[in-house]
């Protein structure tokens, strides 16, 4: 099991909690409008990507890079940012792009922080529902509402 200092967990937890709120605001201010859909697969099959996928990933990468410039970033829409850091962020900017395309609100932004390849923190943000789940490895998972006043164990 990976053990980080409590202060490190707090730093990363605070960052992810703030990022969840920023992502929800970003969606409603910038992305809650008509969008383009294209197919990432050439030939047979269908793997949709929207301009919102790309915008979300750019936004997330910028937030991470500004706060943790030496960390690696692994994303779905762009090349991986490789560094010598033991920390890596894994991003799925829109998990459930097909749901996003048809207007189903169950799509989410998924972000994981890994230390030496092992997940230590995770975020599943649901902007339309104004809720997000936050988890620290081997700890309880929390559900936050847009007011952040009510926390529930999940």
Model-derived regions: residue spans:
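Ser/Thr-centric signal marking residues that sit
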Residues: 50, 97, 145
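Single conserved hydrophobic/aromatic residue that forms the stacking wall/gate
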Residues: 144-154
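Short, glycine/serine-rich, charged loops/turns that create anion-binding
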Residues: 78, 127-128, 153
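N-terminal subdomain of lithium-sensitive/metallo-dependent phosphomonoesterases centered on the IMPase/IPPase/PAP
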Residues: 1-94
């Amino acid at each position: 099991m990976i053990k980080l200092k409590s202060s490190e967990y707090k730093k990363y937890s605070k960052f992810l909690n703030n990022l969840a709120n920023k992502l929800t605001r970003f969606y409603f201010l910038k992305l809650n409008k008509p969008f383009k859909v294209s197919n990432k697969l050439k030939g047979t099959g269908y793997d949709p990507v929207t301009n919102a996928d790309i915008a979300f990933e750019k936004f997330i990468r910028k937030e991470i890079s500004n706060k943790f410039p030496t960390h690696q970033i692994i994303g779905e829409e762009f090349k991986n940012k490789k560094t010598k850091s033991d920390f890596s962020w894994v991003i799925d900017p829109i998990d459930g792009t097909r749901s996003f395309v048809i207007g189903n609100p169950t799509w989410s932004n998924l972000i994981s922080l890994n230390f030496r390849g092992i997940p230590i923190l995770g975020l599943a943000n649901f902007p339309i529902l104004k809720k997000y789940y936050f988890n620290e490895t081997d700890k309880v998972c929390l559900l936050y509402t847009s007011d952040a006043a009510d926390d529930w164990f999940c």
